[in-house]
């Protein structure tokens, strides 16, 4: 994979950088600027080299139309604060305003182009249409840096097609992500433990299939665990269940046994009379995993399982975690996710290499107040890190080879 140093001397050069600024907003207030901060090392390095830094990114799903509430204006403002520099926002992605703002740049300046997904061609399935659009963006720059790890699993105009038109390389963030995820999956120090949670088994099928012969231990919680418990013959009450995945999951349980992979499931769960929303009161109770009442819904792993999961994680040299253990947004059902996060922090302190997969696990770690430096690596890509763990070829990385 080509990296920044492969681009040579960038002084005075116009460098297009595809970043991942898809941040959560409350109105125009950014509620988590983690993704913006993750892009700073690449931006600062390029500025120090005297490049003209032209940033592009998407925000939300405007579906190819201009949606004012999804403008990157709040991102430009926050970037300016973090860099201590003015970051003008172009009114378009490649039109007159973008061209004028780029033409006015001095060495070391930073400009942000407006939301690439305001253009229908950005996510078009028609390769020719995307390529023609990418050429218009590429005309603004003299080199391309791919630094939005959150989008490398998609072939889109601003991260895939642009790479065909300009000398292209991975930015520092993408390089760091690929190194960390490769280290965990290609040659992990053992014991290698994979912790999976989140609501659906179907989202994690590929990861389980790819890692069933690589991991020493699979630890499973979250909503997806009830399909595992049901596959073992337990009743799961009104808990989330994917009936159509039962046969697959039975197969995984058999394969794990055959491969000598330790499969760790909760021994107790925290249940409630239903999902804690609207009129449903929060009245948690702890029951054995094989004795969930017919009218109750499992929403977290129980205290015994929290200790079990924590100890299994600490007894590891490599840990990859993707997906929360319960409905962590509700304090009564957050203890399982906290226990797993604490397990990773304790394992890291003891010398293990730990990765928090992007998406919900990363936001859980932040929302629950864990320090980012307590983990070896917190991924910025939800879908991208999952597909990497599935062993898939990611189009946005392939074009940087």
Curated annotation (Swiss-Prot):
Give a GO molecular function annotation for the protein: ADP binding
Pathway listed: Carbohydrate degradation; glycolysis; pyruvate from D-glyceraldehyde 3-phosphate: step 2/5
Query: For binding ATP, which residues are annotated in this chain's numbering?
Result: 204, 298, 329, 358-361
Taxonomic superkingdom: Bacteria
Which Gene Ontology BP terms does the record give? gluconeogenesis; glycolytic process
GO terms for CC?
cytosol
Concerning SUPFAM superfamilies, the annotation shows:
Phosphoglycerate kinase
- For whether the record's keyword set contains Metal-binding, the answer is no
The record's similarity note reads: Belongs to the phosphoglycerate kinase family.
PANTHER family cross-referenced by the UniProt entry:
PHOSPHOGLYCERATE KINASE, PHOSPHOGLYCERATE KINASE 1, CHLOROPLASTIC-RELATED
Q: How does it assemble?
A: Monomer.
UniProt-recorded name of the protein? Phosphoglycerate kinase
**UniProt organism field:** Bifidobacterium longum (strain DJO10A)
């Amino acid at each position: 994979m080509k990296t920044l140093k492969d681009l040579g001397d960038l002084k005075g050069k116009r460098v297009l950088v595809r970043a991942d600024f898809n941040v959560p907003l409350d109105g125009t207030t950014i509620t988590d600027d983690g993704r913006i901060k993750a892009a700073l090392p690449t931006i600062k390095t390029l500025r120090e080299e005297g490049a003209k830094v032209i940033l592009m990114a998407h925000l939300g799903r405007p579906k190819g139309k201009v949606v004012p509430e999804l403008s990157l204006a709040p991102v430009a403002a926050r970037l300016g604060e973090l860099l201590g520099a003015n970051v003008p926002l172009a009114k378009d992605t490649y039109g007159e305003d973008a061209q004028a703002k780029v033409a006015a740049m001095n060495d070391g300046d930073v400009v942000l182009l407006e939301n690439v997904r305001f253009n229908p061609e950005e996510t078009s399935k028609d390769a020719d249409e995307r390529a023609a659009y990418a050429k218009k963006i590429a005309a603004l720059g003299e080199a391309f840096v791919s630094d939005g790890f959150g989008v490398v699993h998609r072939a889109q105009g601003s991260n895939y097609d642009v790479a065909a038109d300009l000398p292209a390389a991975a930015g520092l963030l993408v390089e760091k992500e690929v190194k960390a995820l490769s280290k965990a999956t290609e040659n992990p120090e053992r014991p290698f433990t994979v912790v999976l949670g989140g609501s659906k088994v179907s989202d994690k099928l590929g990861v389980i299939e790819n890692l069933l012969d690589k991991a020493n231990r699979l630890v499973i919680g979250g909503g997806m665990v009830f399909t595992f418990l049901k596959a073992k013959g337990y009743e799961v009450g009104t808990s989330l269940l994917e009936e159509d995945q039962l046969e697959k999951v039975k197969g995984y349980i058999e394969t794990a046994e055959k491969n000598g992979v330790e499969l760790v499931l909760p021994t107790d769960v925290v249940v409630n009379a239903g999902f804690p929303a609207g009129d449903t009161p929060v009245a948690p109770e702890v029951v054995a995993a094989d004795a969930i009442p017919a009218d109750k819904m499992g929403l977290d792993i129980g205290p015994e399982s929290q200790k079990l999961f924590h100890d299994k994680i600490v007894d590891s040299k490599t840990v990859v975690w993707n997906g929360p253990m319960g409905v962590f947004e509700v304090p009564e059902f957050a203890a399982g996710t906290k226990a797993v996060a604490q397990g990773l922090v304790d394992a890291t302190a003891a010398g293990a290499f730990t990765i928090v997969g992007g998406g919900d696990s990363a936001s859980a770690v932040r929302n629950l107040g864990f320090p980012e430096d307590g983990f070896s690596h917190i991924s910025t890509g939800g879908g991208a890190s999952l597909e990497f763990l599935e062993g898939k070829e990611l189009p946005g990385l392939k074009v940087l080879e």
